[in-house]
Structure formats: C-alpha cells, structure tokens
Amino acid sequence: MAQLNFGGTVENVVIRDEFPLEKAREVLKNETIAVIGYGVQGPGQALNLRDNGFNVIVGQRQGKTYDKAVADGWVPGETLFGIEEACEKGTIIMCLLSDAAVMSVWPTIKPYLTVAA
C-alpha cells in the first residue's frame, strides 16, 4: 500500500501490484455494475469497465445521452435501462449523475442501496 499526500491529507492507496486487474475481475465476476448516468463521467467509466471484462449495465433516462449510450454500443433492454430498472438489476450501483440530477433521482435510487456485508 502506498501513502500519497492529496493536498495535505495523507491517504493509504492500494496499488496495482497489490490488486491487479485479474484479481478485480475475480472479485467482481458475479456482480453487475450499474452505472447510473451517462453524462460527463458515465461514458468513460462504463466503457472502461466493459472493455476490461466487467459485467456493466447503464441506467439513463431517455434523451440525448440515452441516444449517445446506444451509439456507444449499449443495447436497450440488455445493457441499457431506465434508472430504476438498472438500480434493480445492479448488485453494485455507481451514481455518476450531476449533483442537481441526484437531488431529483435520489428517491428512485435510495431503495436499492444496501449496507455492504
């Protein structure tokens, strides 16, 4: 583990040698990662996870960014869903919505969050 200084705060950070990609794939092999939001952060993170062999779905409401998700290869009803359905299907939920969007969507997401074991 490395200790890194982020603006005066020292953090312990797991490095790649300690947790390589193959180990991450093994740990997450039975998980479905639901990326909620396909605006600024969603595409990069969802595509990176998918390209690295993780089981990923996207939750996005209809509109321009939904169409972008389709253009990026996400398949409606298979890997692309509305927000609530993606939360229901995901075992890990990554909320990548803007702060403003989270405020309006939070009541939809909250029931699907659980305390990790």
Predicted region positions:
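NAD(P)+-binding Rossmann beta1-loop-alpha1 motif at the extreme N-terminus of oxidoreductases
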Residues: 2-77
